[in-house]
Amino acid sequence: AGFHMNFDDSSNVGAVQSGTSQGNFDKYNLTAADQATDTPTNNFAIGNPLNVTPPGIFTEGATRWVSVNGTGMNGAWNLATIALTGGKWHCEVKCISTSSYYQWGISPTHPNDSFSSRCFYRSDGNIYNAGSGGNTTGHTTYTAGDIIGMSYDASANTVIFSKNGTAVVTKTAIAHNDPYFFGGTGLSAGTYTGDFNFGGYTSYTISSPETDANGYGTFEYAPPSGYYALCT
């Protein structure tokens, strides 16, 4: 016998579809916060465990990035599963803890192989950008508890960085033959943790849910007009 489960009731994740003879499954250590709509017809991005540099790892369904004692100038890197090809795309990342600097932004392919191509917003207010305008300093700083927004326009090749729903700066990335991805890193040998939110599941609590213009995704802050959750 099989089981038909729609997962359409967040208060009863173990519910078996009505009309079948089987009872519901019990759930353990699961709440409504541990689930999100993500189906073959609309798949949201997550972190890509196959495209990271050790000792960084993804947890929480590949949405929480944890790096401990990264080595070298730029620590351990990560990228999302869906490339930013065409259109306008948005994600959030909540800074959880760090003993060094956070860096969140966009990069083509694997960041360690493209140091001269990425565009990142660091927690000390510095922007590291290989594109037009280059590196800049003196922007708004951020720390644990802050939510950084990244909104990428593939046609214009620009990225809007925001902090807690307020735009900080718009940067033009360098033209690149490979598509960009959302991603991030810490700095040097620091320890840092961040929770990504591409619109699907995220491990941090969202107090005032916002969606994109198509009604997709769940974000703490509304995406800029015309930008969408990173999903299929």
Where are these regions (language model features)?
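PRY/SPRY (B30.2) beta-sandwich protein-interaction domains
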Residues: 1-232
